[in-house]
Amino acid sequence: MRLKNIHLFLIILAILSGSAFAKEVNIYTSRHYDSDTVLYENFTNETGIKVNIISSKSKALLERLRSEGENSPADIFITVDAGNLWKAQEYGLFRKINSKKIDSIVPKNLRGKNNEWIALAKRARVLFYNPKKYSDDELKDLSYEDLSSSKWEKKLSIRSSNNLYNQSLVASMIVKHGESFTEEWAKGLVNNFARKPQGNDRAQIIAVANGEADLAIANSYYLGLMLSGKKGEKQLNAGKKVKILFPSQND
């Protein structure tokens, strides 16, 4: 997280923890980063409020919150992807956040329609390509919409449509272009698959590195994870063979 986001996180945590006299705050989170742990520790050091963490996958936490109902000890739910926020809203798990302080530091487009949630960070769903096959100049104007073109027939790699990241990408297309356009776009996208969807985001990047596909759709931060070497030599070597492209930059 950037320094600005760290300060924002601590402010929000303080506000959402309730009373300034609260002795502890219970957080259900699907995030699993060391940086978050440091933030919680800093919060406790600054406020004296203990942070209790329940960590699991978003789906499991959502079901737990539903089953606990009004008796849930959770004060804050931290998840990833707007799709999970939508599910939580459908389940009626959120209540409106009334805070002029939060309203002043979090832009309206990064808050729920009725202030039932706020965004702390954004993820980028981008394209990966082999620079030995394509130059930066060749792809600089590429958009998400272009991916359904016959030019990319049998050249795309992407994980299953069951994945929430892909569902959110489709949702963004519907918001921008409407359902009819997006349906035709999705059909073209499927026709351009280089292989049957399989594996996680890193598997798509590896497919490009190995020459199984020309373009992969995946979240940007996975390349950083691969290049860190923490996931083994195979992923490190694959990460070195690809480059990131942020599509639709002319929009």
What is the role of each PLM region?
Residues 30, 34, 73-212, 223-229:
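Extracytoplasmic ligand-binding site segments that recognize negatively charged/polar headgroups
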Residues 46-47, 180, 233-238:
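Short helix-capping segments at alpha-helix termini
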Residues 26, 126-128, 243:
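Residues embedded in well-ordered beta-strands
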Residues 1-6:
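Positively charged n-region of N-terminal signal peptides that target proteins for export
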Residues 199-206, 233-251:
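Extracytoplasmic/periplasmic substrate-recognition and gating elements
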Residues 51-53, 156, 242-244:
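Generic structural signal for residues in well-ordered beta-strands
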